[in-house]
Regions:
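Hydrophobic helical membrane-anchoring modules
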Residues: 1-2, 171-225
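A conserved acidic beta->alpha catalytic loop
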Residues: 41-49, 89-90
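Acidic helix N-cap motif at the loop->helix transition within catalytic regions
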Residues: 16-19, 46-55
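Conserved donor NDP-sugar-binding/catalytic core segment of glycosyltransferases
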Residues: 93-121
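Cell-envelope/extracellular polymer assembly enzymes that use nucleotide-activated donors
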Residues: 4-6, 36, 168
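Short beta-strand/loop segment that forms part of the nucleotide-sugar
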Residues: 22-26, 33-43
Length: 225
């Protein structure tokens, strides 16, 4: 990539997953692709902030809302291109070489999902996520997104909703979303804890309720309060 990019990571008690995510970004630092790293924390009570400060990130703190945290992070970025990652989603080795040299500023890019777990269930859920993204132009936040700030501004900036912020963004971008041939590995911890089928059904139920008109605020209150 000929231009530098900023990386934005929203965090909340991410001490166990953040270090490995940051490690995968090092090749971008060494290649001169990453201009700055912005970590926006939602009130962690573990070592997340210390980890962020140790690597020289621009650190800010706000109320816990992933959409709001990402919005604040994008605002603090110094580069025109922004790579938004979840704290538990890691880019595969060699990702720098597969990023387009001159990405289209009128397009947004996402990655191919896989889980850090073996087995049929993990492969099935990841396959569905990648098909959903391709067929319906609906990648989720754990697939990462590379977007130009001008494009983001043209669609009303990053959604600040407490839930479904990634779906709102994807629906605004539509067919301007392009899949990159780069794997991104996300944590399977919640799926394993709750059960792959139960967690998958819950996510699908959330999506359907949102598409049928339930507000993100109401969904957040229902599922997280």
């Amino acid at each position: 990539m000929s231009q530098k990019l900023s990386v934005v990571i929203p965090t909340l008690n991410a001490q166990h997953v953040l270090p490995s995510t940051l490690e995968t970004l090092m090749e971008g630092v060494f290649a001169g692709v990453i201009g700055d790293l912005v970590i926006v924390d939602g009130g962690s009570n573990d070592a997340t902030l210390n980890i962020a400060k140790e690597v020289g990130a621009i650190v800010s703190e706000t109320t816990p809302s992933r959409g709001g945290q990402i919005f604040a992070g994008v605002f603090a970025c110094k580069c025109d291109w922004v790579l938004i990652l979840h704290a538990d989603s890691r880019l595969s080795q060699g990702w720098v070489e597969l990023i387009p040299t001159a990405p289209d500023p009128e397009r947004a890019y996402y990655f191919q999902l896989q889980f850090d777990a073996a087995g049929f269930a993990a492969r099935w859920v990841a396959t569905w996520a990648n098909l959903r993204s391709k067929i319906f132009a609906l990648p989720y936040g754990d697939q990462g997104i590379l977007i130009n700030k001008n494009l983001l501004a043209s669609i009303g900036d990053y959604p600040t909703a407490p839930l479904m912020e990634d779906v709102i963004l994807a629906r605004k971008l539509g067919r301007r979303l392009i899949a990159l041939p780069i794997m991104i590995t996300t944590s399977s911890e919640k799926y394993i804890a709750q059960g792959w089928l139960r967690r998958g059904f819950r996510n699908l139920a959330l999506l359907f309720q949102f598409l049928l008109g339930t507000t993100p605020e109401a969904l957040y209150k229902k599922y997280y309060s």
